[in-house]
């Protein structure tokens, strides 16, 4: 799908959260931000995207989806992650479709090494599913083909 205009609301604390990260993780997290926004613009049914904080982490929420968070943690400084609602079917489905291309942590995250090349196609499919979750949660494999 071609990119479309969507309403994006950025809460002030969203940008401030990035000041707490070291330089290399900031670059990776900013890249994920851009990828999430671009994917939202390409995703059917997504007309609005809020960028804020949830549990102190940069978070994204569409008008029809589940919350998606990104973070880097000092206890695992060589990695960063994309976090999903743990009570959803998202990670369980992604694991069936995309393991071992993507690395998972429990039922809540996709983990990346700071020096890893990201599998863009698979990651965008995961982001789309999260952004549309409330419309697709009843579908087999969340409608991912």
Task: Please report, for each region that a protein language model flagged, where it lies by residue.
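Charge-dense, helix-prone N-terminal extensions
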Residues: 1-145
């Amino acid at each position: 799908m071609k990119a479309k205009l969507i309403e994006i609301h950025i809460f002030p604390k969203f940008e401030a959260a990035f000041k707490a990260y070291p330089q290399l993780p900031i670059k990776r997290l900013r890249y994920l931000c851009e990828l999430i926004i671009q994917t939202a613009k390409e995703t059917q049914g997504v007309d609005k995207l809020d960028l804020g904080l949830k549990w102190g982490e940069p978070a994204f929420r569409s008008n029809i989806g589940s919350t998606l968070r990104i973070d880097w943690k000092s206890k695992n400084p060589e990695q960063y992650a994309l976090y999903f609602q743990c009570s959803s079917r998202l990670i369980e489905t992604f694991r069936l479709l995309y393991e071992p291309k993507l690395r998972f942590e429990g039922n809540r995250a996709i983990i990346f090494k700071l020096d890893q090349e990201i599998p863009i196609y698979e990651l965008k499919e995961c982001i789309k599913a999260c952004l549309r979750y409330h419309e697709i949660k009843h579908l087999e494999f969340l409608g991912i083909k």
